């Protein structure tokens, strides 16, 4: 199919004509700014980013409080759960499934959280596979407040100190979102449409 024929079909579907003016992209001014290393300041910046990304955040004093918050959510929504957690987190009550593709909620432990972007960082390991963070329609991440960092560069520094990049590093920044050829944003097509983060104070 010729390019113009294809574009004309797209225009017809959108109710547009060929000579419609193209919007000029906005110009953004990017300024480097110093970050505080104070944990409370990093947490507040991270919370601000999560609010912009439509991510629900729960502040938990302890690991057990975070687990109870998850259990309450599962009971309220009647969700089946699949997870990529190590043995430290065993004991969460709920309706479990071994198949992440059949679960309503996936649960993972994030190695770090990046305040600047609102991202959580997962590192692939034997007990941390990608399925639980990709396949269910909703996903939750446990992250310790002590693992909040300012920028991506801080994560790379820690990885380098640990011997370099592992097999897989995944960064999750809000719900999965994609856009089609005309920029229409769709949430949840290629991953979870709901994201929850549980920040644990004393971990």
Segments and roles (model prediction):
Residues 1-203:
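The feature marks the mature, well-folded catalytic cores of soluble enzymes
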């Amino acid at each position: 199919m010729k390019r113009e024929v294809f574009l004309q079909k797209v225009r017809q579907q959108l109710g547009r004509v060929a000579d419609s003016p193209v919007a000029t992209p906005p110009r953004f001014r990017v300024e480097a700014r110093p970050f505080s290393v104070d944990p409370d300041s990093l947490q507040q910046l991270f919370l601000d980013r999560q609010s912009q990304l439509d991510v629900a955040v729960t502040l938990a004093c302890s690991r057990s409080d975070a687990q109870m918050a998850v259990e309450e959510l599962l009971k309220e929504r009647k969700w089946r759960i699949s997870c990529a957690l190590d043995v430290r987190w065993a004991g969460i009550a709920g309706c479990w499934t071994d198949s992440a593709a059949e679960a309503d909620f996936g649960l993972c432990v994030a190695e770090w959280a990046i305040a600047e972007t609102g991202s959580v960082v997962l590192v692939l390991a034997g007990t941390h596979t990608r399925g639980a963070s990709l396949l269910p329609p909703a996903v939750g991440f446990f992250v310790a407040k002590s693992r909040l960092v300012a920028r991506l560069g801080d994560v790379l520094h820690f990885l380098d100190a640990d011997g370099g990049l592992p097999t897989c590093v995944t960064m999750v920044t809000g719900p999965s979102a994609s856009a089609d050829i005309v920029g229409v944003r769709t949430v949840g097509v290629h991953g979870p449409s709901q994201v929850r983060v549980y920040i644990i104070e004393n971990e």
